[in-house]
Amino acid sequence: HIPNCKFFIYFYPLKRYNTNIYLLFERNKDLERKQLAPGVFITSMSAAKFNRCRITIHLRFPAKRETATDAAVLALVLERGYAACPDMTALSRRLAELYGADLGVDLSSAGPDRVLSADICGIKDTYALAGENLTDAYADIVFGTIFDPYLVDGIFDPEAVRIETETQARRLEAEFNSKRLYCVRQARRKFFGNSPAGIELGGYPGELVNVTPASLKAEYDRILSTASIDVMVQGVDEARVADLLLRKLESIRRDPQPFALPMAMPRTPLRHFKEEIPGLTQAKLCMLFTTGGESDPPSVSILRVAMSVLGGSATSRLFRNVREKQSLCYYCGSAAQRSTGVMMIDSGVEPGKEQQAEAAILAELEGLKNGPITQEEMDDCRRGLLSSMDALSDSLAALEGWYYGQITRGEPLYPPEYGKVLTSAVTLDEVRQALQSYSYSVCYDVTAKPGTAGKGGAEDV
């Protein structure tokens, strides 16, 4: 008999979760997920080892090409304040009163969907000097930020919209200054084209002039109506937070939409793109691969190990052979996204050596697909992943991200300890099969214009 403990047994295909039986002891006090209303969930996680607590609300909604720029600016405007604290000065003062609590608002991607998030982190009620009810204060701020924005005559404050539109314009212009980021985004634009996964997270520079207080309010209303809402609480009274959340939702008409299904771009003949920039000292190479829409993509655990072996660690093939042995690049890494079926390899090389680096990268990938993989290199690469999972328990934000990632992928919730079990169970054949599923699709090269190359070096310019 194990007190206060529930048994959960999940059965899944071998390919997805590495094991036929997933057996997990899940203590109620450590992790519990409840549905409060259609499309509204709350997940409570233990934070016993921390003196701080955290409340986060995630709104996952379908991305729209027509309103992508409004959504990007909206996140910036919401972070400035809400009805009870209508400007940044009042909001900063209120957070300072709560022993220096931290508030953040962010817009991110979940495959073809978008996620608007607001989080607040501060000390627990136990440590309040005067016995204040900090949980209610935190919930009031983070929910106020999302559900009670500061409005002027029913629309967003024109001055706040003007300021944050200019801020977003500067952010988009700055993309070109980071050539690595610029190359990756240019490659993704060619790769995804007009597909839903290709909608720009930061919006479009030419459409910022169309952002108005009224258009922001229309996008805000659409998000509240269609979003699936997940609240994640750590170290606070879940019941009090849930009660306040439901009261905030009482006056909102809701029609939550299902999550977008995983998608992948179709396999196509390889396309090469080259862009020349005067005076560039380090060329950038971004190579994108697609699974072509497999109905049963590899599990996240398999992809993590596969990317670590290929180019995601200091013991990977690309790092050891392309960077160290052949000295063909300053950096060379790989990453994969299960929801869109894309694998990316990007590197920084000397101008003029892009083709040589590309050939070496493809040779290493081919070697992993069809050549031998030793257990030693698997274990070396796996060791870093296991260490990073151990570190998750040292951060409230990292733990929350771990569990919300599982929610976005439609997986059962399991702790990092079981993630280590799944990672340790990944086999050589599973890594090979995962890499074999990718087909080379797009190569984007940002290099120096002939006759203008700099001296070369590690600088990202």
Where is each model-derived feature located?
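Short, positively charged and aromatic/hydrophobic N-terminal segments
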Residues: 6, 10-13, 17-27
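N- or domain-start disorder-to-order transition segments that initiate the globular core
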Residues: 27-54
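M16 family metallopeptidases and their MPP-like homologs
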Residues: 43-45, 51-71, 88-144, 148, ...
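Short, polar/flexible loop-turn hinges at active-site or ligand-entry regions and domain interfaces
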Residues: 81-84, 126-129, 148-157
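An aromatic/glycine/proline-enriched structural segment found at the starts
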Residues: 197, 201-207, 222-294, 453-461
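A conserved active-site cap/scaffold subdomain adjacent to cofactor or substrate pockets
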Residues: 295, 300-312
